[in-house]
Regions:
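Low-complexity, acidic Ser/Thr/Pro/Gly-rich terminal tails and inter-domain linkers that flank the onset
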Residues: 33-61, 74-76
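Bacterial N-terminal signal peptides that target proteins for export
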Residues: 2-13
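Bacterial signal peptide processing site
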Residues: 25-28
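C-terminal motif of bacterial Sec signal peptides marking the signal peptidase cleavage site
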Residues: 20-23
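Short, hydrophobic/aromatic beta-strand segments
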Residues: 77-85
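Predominantly extracellular/secreted Zn2+-dependent metalloproteases
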Residues: 57-62, 67-70, 74, 86-115, ...
């Protein structure tokens, strides 16, 4: 899953368009003498407009289900956009609300855990500049034939953590008839993986990597054991550890957290887990939620500590919680600061946020 956006920018919803990510700290329009502050600022409504269009109203089963997305900077100063939540490159997040006959259509793409955004993760639009990209909706479940409704729709809170304003960022609606087709989501490899006990390795893991992954599995399993024991043996109450990561205490929510960690522990203890080393992205790891129990580890994973904040063991907790068959978590907020804020503003979402589970399990700094 995707993570560690540190609240770099603010988002404001548009009416028929959407206001996207914040301003960069560079001089504005020289003619007007406008000067931007050097740090991120909250944008006005409509600073960046997003429009959605389709070339055709009907898409056959053998055709790619594509739409055109245009982002336009409507201001007199440059704006900087985080690529992860734009269609600038490949689609990595559920940026669209897709429905069929009024029912939500599932996003079947991967859930990433990322390190903090770097300069290279942003793009800049000059005043009046537009960026147009063609987006393939193949990561959504288009297996049924019918009239699909599509719009760009991203939660402000999901994009920037709980420090962002509540609400949805929406574009115009587009309706298109799509003939059902097989999923384009990557399926598990048919290649027989190397097997060690209940843990398999694929993606050409080296001997050193397999040893590191086994240590990470042991660390993650120990965290799952500790979390389950804590929630099972501690008298349910507003303890510091619980409230910090899951918000205001209620017995129902405590039991939800316990049920989730019991499932995470069970996955570590009893399920046939595959760890894949093929990912070369700068992220920590990712999973396909409907493909348990395969975890793809990426470059940042190898440099993470074994335990502690954003650790190897914690990364495996994070990814394990994403599986629909385990806890079915999402990514609503990223990083410790935003995860803590999410627990305050929305305990329900905190209980559905992978980072909150990871940080509860890592318990760094230690909370009783």
């Amino acid at each position: 899953m995707s993570k560690n956006l540190r609240g770099n920018f603010k988002w404001l919803a548009g009416i028929a368009s959407v206001s996207l990510l914040g301003a960069c700290g560079v001089p504005g329009d020289a003619a007007s003498g406008e000067q931007l502050v050097g740090e991120a600022q909250e944008l006005r409504q409509g600073d960046v407009a997003v429009s959605l269009s389709a070339k055709t109203s009907t898409i056959g089963a053998q055709e790619r289900a594509t739409l055109s997305v245009t982002l336009t900077n409507t201001t007199r100063h440059p704006v900087r956009l985080l690529k992860w939540y734009t269609p600038a490159e490949e689609l990595e997040e559920p940026l669209f609300s897709v429905t069929l006959n009024g029912e939500a259509v599932a996003f079947e793409g991967p859930h990433y855990k990322r390190p903090a955004a770097r300069d290279t993760d942003f793009l800049t639009l000059a005043p009046g500049e537009s960026l147009t990209r063609t987006v393939d909706l193949g990561l959504y479940d288009l297996s049924r034939t019918g009239n699909y409704g599509v719009r760009f729709e991203v939660e402000a809170q999901k994009a920037h953590g709980s420090s962002a304003k509540q609400g949805l960022l929406k574009s115009n609606d587009v309706n298109v008839w799509i003939e059902g087709r097989a999923s384009s989501v990557q399926q598990p490899s048919d290649v027989t993986p190397s097997l060690t006990s209940s843990i398999s390795y694929s993606g050409r893991c080296s001997t050193t990597q397999m040893s590191t992954l086994l240590d990470a599995m042991n660390a993650g399993s120990a965290m799952a054991d500790n979390s389950t024991a804590y929630l099972s043996t501690t008298t349910p109450a507003a303890t510091a550890r619980y409230v910090t990561w899951f918000g205001a205490f209620s017995l129902t929510n405590w039991n939800t957290a316990k049920t989730q960690f019991v499932a995470i522990k069970d996955a570590f203890d009893t399920k046939p887990i595959t760890l894949d080393c093929s990912c070369k992205k700068s992220y920590y790891a990712y999973v396909y939620p409907n493909q348990p129990y395969k975890i793809y580890v990426c470059n940042a994973f190898w440099n993470a500590p074994m335990t502690g904040t954003d650790s190897k063991g914690g990364t495996l907790i994070h990814e394990m919680s994403h599986f629909t068959a385990v806890a079915g978590t999402d990514d609503h907020a990223y990083g410790q600061t935003n995860a803590k804020s999410l627990a305050i503003s929305s305990p329900t979402q905190a209980l559905n946020n992978a980072d909150n589970h990871e940080y509860f399990a890592e318990n760094t700094p230690f909370l009783q």
